[in-house]
Amino acid sequence: MGTVNSLEAGIDEAGRGPVIGPMVIAIVGWSNSEAEGIGVKDSKQLTPSGRSRLYKLIVSKAPCVRHVIVEPSEIDYYVNRGLLNELEAIKMSELIKACSGVTRVYVDSPDPNPSRFRGFINVKDVELIVLNHADESIPLVSAASIVAKVIRDTIISRLKETYGDFGSGYPSDPRTISALRRWINNGTLPPIVRRSWRTIKRMTNSRLF
């Protein structure tokens, strides 16, 4: 994929909330009209096959597609210091700088105060448009959401080949809780677990499992 003189871009993440697995943040540099033209929509509204189809189109057509994988150990470091939003902003800043020619970036803010989150993003000469739920209204952010989700789902599938089925990885999933309980009872939490999550702290401090 080449670069052009001026690009818009969208940024979004997948996997902020799970207790298992990495978070993936992606940027797509293109145009909203072209992203909309291939039928891009919020990844949560798509089937896995629909996401896969659009992912292939985005990667083949968009001038800039980049992603970063944030491992549980790094997430834990920042969460234990109350800095998860700052961690996302650091990674987003790196992605923006990696997309040559980007002049305007739409960001899906994880912070309920988008202007506060905007202040964490360290880039120059780029117009930042930071919104809540941007993946629902901005095609480029939807495209980034699709890229992040497909990449993370692929990683999760590979992790299950190594560690067995742990469900979705979200604390609300009984299969996830069952896997966590099994690992805790065996005395070893694998490195794919986010130890900073309250779910883990409750389970390791409880005698009810």
Swiss-Prot record:
GO terms for molecular function: manganese ion binding; RNA binding; RNA-DNA hybrid ribonuclease activity. Its cofactor is Mn(2+); Mg(2+). Residues 6-209 form the RNase H type-2 domain. Signal peptide: none annotated. It catalyses: Endonucleolytic cleavage to 5'-phosphomonoester. The keyword Hydrolase applies. A divalent metal cation binds at D12, E13, D108. The keyword rRNA-binding does not apply. NCBIfam families: ribonuclease HII. This is Ribonuclease HII. It comes from Caldivirga maquilingensis (strain ATCC 700844 / DSM 13496 / JCM 10307 / IC-167).
